[in-house]
Amino acid sequence: KIINNNIVSAFDETGLEVVIMGRGIGFQMKRGQKVPVEKVEKIFRIKSQSIAGQLKELLAKMPLEQVQISNEIISYAKKTMKLKLNQSIYVTLTDHISFAISRCKKGIHLENALLWEIKRFYPQEFELGRYAVELVKKRLDVEMPEDEAGFIALHFVNAEYGTDIRDAVRFPNQMKEILGIVADELGIEMDE
């Protein structure tokens, strides 16, 4: 099935539905045709039908460059940090990055109230967020604030630990509250 000029849905040799990405891969293709191997840039083998459906829907409306950036960030995380990530990261991170790029182009920057805690409790994931912010700047010339690296880090926490994004936010929030109580009791001011 052709999703757009750059994305097609197909079945691999085992009968598993896959989503295939490549520049112009869907252009002038007909249903049932074999996908030209030389045009394949990435194959998404998603075991969950619901995630596969969300991914196809997301990829259909997103610029290929943004999908490629997201995929590169995920590949970097798996390779350099040796992270085992839930497949939902392809949907959640790609969607987040696309929305963040749109916001930043309009000059809208969201403050990440948990940035300090994210840096302290999830340093590896925060470094991935920094890598993502730098990659977006390099490829698309879109400046993203450091706060965005923190938001991106939470997507990796979620995918790494198999939790809901709300759970990934809950821990640093609780730590922030605990540190506030300790600071109040000791009569000290805590900073970075």
Task: For every predicted segment, state its role.
Residues 1-192:
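A cross-family "folded-core" feature that marks the main globular domain of proteins
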